[in-house]
Curated annotation (Swiss-Prot):
This is Chaperone protein HscA homolog. One of its GO terms (molecular function) is ATP binding. PROSITE patterns: HSP70_1, HSP70_2. The gene is hscA. Belongs to the heat shock protein 70 family.
Length: 617
């Protein structure tokens, strides 16, 4: 006899069975994988007992090498050994060459403008390189856990934009992984820290990794993680310490000629080793080519002081966004290997006036938090134990007539979120509408960041203002934006998923936020002027059409002249920048045409009732 196993919809046939899920910290310098076993979240080691996998991929003639072995080949085979690929994710070739001119790779540009790296195995893109790192981590997890993974949570910097997040998802798909969620790195750290220590209150998560910096201000209360504000820089990290130090060594060695790719990699490797050594020593002797010298911790601190100060400026902005002071912060959590640098810990401690918490390994805390979240999302733990509220860093809006920005989703709104707003047509008979998606805090489109454009066609021809177009902005849990425009009477709609072609650094974010405050008054004046100009255009076009259609039938020549003079006066002031003059011109045109409007209304009613009896009416 055969038995049919029955289970509740959406549940496992064996609900007691533990599903295998992991959290992956896909870092710029190093990557880790962690999982929850027997209620404890721990990072998973490789066969040699190492939990950290260097984020390095080497392409050899007959195989691909990932991790420590690949890193050892960086100096001898720099063109085929890809390091810090996370920095390249979602960026254009032009952007990469501007930001990182010293990279030893042979780049070419693909048809879509994205970078391709030439290796001995052919051309590869950053997504393919990242996929190799993810494959290595997932293989390690499956060997350690003894089964196939049902899902993964992958962490990303809070300031990764849509293209960078989408690229990370694509890399996971290429690696054969089921992505349960992309999780902001500081939020993952908060999960690990909050659950392990049972803290409640305001916590600052200071995350300085190899290639990115993030600061998150979070409120932890009764298992609820709410991100009050985020800040940071997607192009600042320990790698920059290495570059500054390598430049100092070049200057000391009086090297003026260009270095070969191999020499450049050797220099960066030397700088990295020197930086690590200075975390525990007051001075280190270094040698490069024919030069040998000593660098002290004080010199190193001076070299990186401006970079550390940039992180503290981001902390200040995040606190201001959260509307709290540094005194309100209960604890400061340090995340990322670069926070081991003594001057970083001292500077952060001085700024927040408290000793930063380092009880959880700063290299492992993000992976541990991701593992806890993965364990919940895969169904091993009731998700009611924790609520996670991320936020979007910059407002999302739409361009309206006059080059104005109508904000749909304000910055620091918790995600996932969906918001809709209705718009209408500007001209009679308009059958299409261009939807321009913009990002930023300014009032005018020209001062914001353009994300995407798409057209909605098939709008039924109607009088201006009669059509109703509903525009919906939806940001999912991974921070990806989808925009839909629908004409309500017909249901015709158009849709786009926004994927910018390059990243948005915190310097640009900070500039956009600073400008929105600096130019707030000017922006409001510009907006008021643009609004009056749009209204003037509407009045002018409406009166011109009305006069052409009904002027001779309903008005005398003298009456037409009065209205035309008002229209011409409005056209004249419309060209200027005096908001009040335009408003007065609109008012004068309205007053001059009131009788005309009344006669048109009467004529329309008579035409509608012509031939009908009182009973029919």
């Amino acid at each position: 006899m055969a038995f049919l196993q029955i289970s509740e919809p959406g549940q496992s046939a064996a609900p007691h069975q533990h599903k295998l899920a992991v959290g992956i910290d896909l870092g710029t310098t190093n990557s880790l994988v962690a999982s929850v076993r027997s209620g404890e979240a721990n990072t998973l080691p490789d066969m040699k007992g190492n939990v950290i996998l260097p984020s390095v991929v080497q392409y050899q003639d007959d195989k691909i090498c990932v991790g420590a072995n690949a890193y050892q080949s960086a100096a001898s085979d720099p063109q085929n050994t890809i390091i810090s690929v996370k920095r390249l994710m979602g960026r254009s070739l032009k952007d990469i060459q501007t930001r990182y001119p010293d990279l030893p790779y042979q780049f070419t540009e693909s048809d879509n403008g994205l970078p391709v790296i030439h290796t001995t195995q052919g051309d590869v893109n950053p997504i393919q390189v990242s996929a190799e790192i993810l494959k290595s981590l997932s293989n390690r997890a499956e060997v350690t856990l003894g089964g196939s993974l049902e899902g993964v949570v992958i962490t990303v910097p809070a300031y990764f934009d849509d293209a960078q997040r989408a690229g990370t998802k694509d890399a996971a798909t290429l690696a054969g992984l089921n992505v349960l969620r992309l999780l902001n790195e500081p939020t993952a750290a908060a999960i690990a820290y909050g659950l392990d220590s049972g803290q409640e209150g305001i916590i600052a998560v200071y995350d300085l990794g190899g290639g990115t910096f993030d600061i998150s201000i979070l409120r932890l209360s009764k298992g609820v993680f709410e991100v009050l504000a985020t800040g940071g820089d997607s192009a600042l990290g320990g790698d920059d310490f290495d570059h500054v130090l390598s430049q100092w060594i070049k200057d000391q060695a009086e090297i003026t000629t260009a270095l070969s790719n191999q020499e450049q990699r050797e220099l960066l490797t030397l700088a990295t080793e020197t930086k690590v050594a200075l975390s525990d020593a007051d001075s280190v002797t270094v040698s490069f080519k024919e030069w040998s010298g000593t660098i002290t911790a004080d010199i190193f601190n001076q070299l990186i002081q401006s970079l550390v100060k940039k992180t503290l400026m981001a902390c200040r902005r995040a606190l201001k966004d959260a509307d709290i002071s540094s005194e309100d912060v209960m604890e400061v959590v340090m995340v990322g290997g670069s926070t081991r640098t003594p001057i970083v810990r001292r500077s952060v401690g001085d700024y927040f006036a408290k000793t930063p918490l380092t009880s959880i390994d700063p290299d492992q805390v993000v992976a541990i938090g991701a593992a806890i979240q993965a364990d919940i999302l895969v169904g091993n733990k009731p998700d009611t134990e924790m609520l996670l509220l991320d936020v979007i860093p910059l407002s999302l809006g739409i361009e309206t007539m006059g080059g104005l920005v109508e904000k749909i989703i304000p910055r620091n709104t918790t995600i996932p979120v969906a918001k809709a707003q209705e718009f209408t047509t500007f001209k009679d008979g308009q059958t299409g509408m261009m939807v321009h998606v913009v990002q930023g805090e300014r009032e005018m489109v020209e001062d914001g960041r353009s994300l995407a454009r798409f057209s909605l066609k098939g709008i039924p021809p109607m009088t201006a203002g009669a059509a109703h177009i509903r525009v919906t902005y939806q940001v999912d849990a991974d921070g990806l934006l989808s925009v839909t425009a629908m004409e309500k009477s017909t249901g015709v709609q158009s849709h786009i998923q926004v994927k910018p072609s390059y990243g948005l650094s915190d310097n640009e974010v900070a500039t956009m936020l600073k400008d929105s405050m600096t130019y707030a008054k000017d922006d409001m004046k510009a907006r008021a002027l643009a609004e009056q100009q749009v209204e003037a255009d509407r009045v002018i076009e409406g009166l011109v059409v009305a006069l052409n259609n009904d002027g001779d039938a309903l008005l005398s020549k003298e009456e037409q002249t009065v209205i035309l003079q008002a229209v011409e006066a409005l056209i004249t002031v419309r060209k200027g920048t005096d908001t009040q003059a335009i408003e007065d011109g609109i008012k004068h045109a309205d007053e001059a045409s009131q009788e005309f409007a009344a006669r048109r209304m009467d004529a329309s009613i008579r035409a509608a009732l012509a031939g009908q009896s009182i009973d029919e009416v």
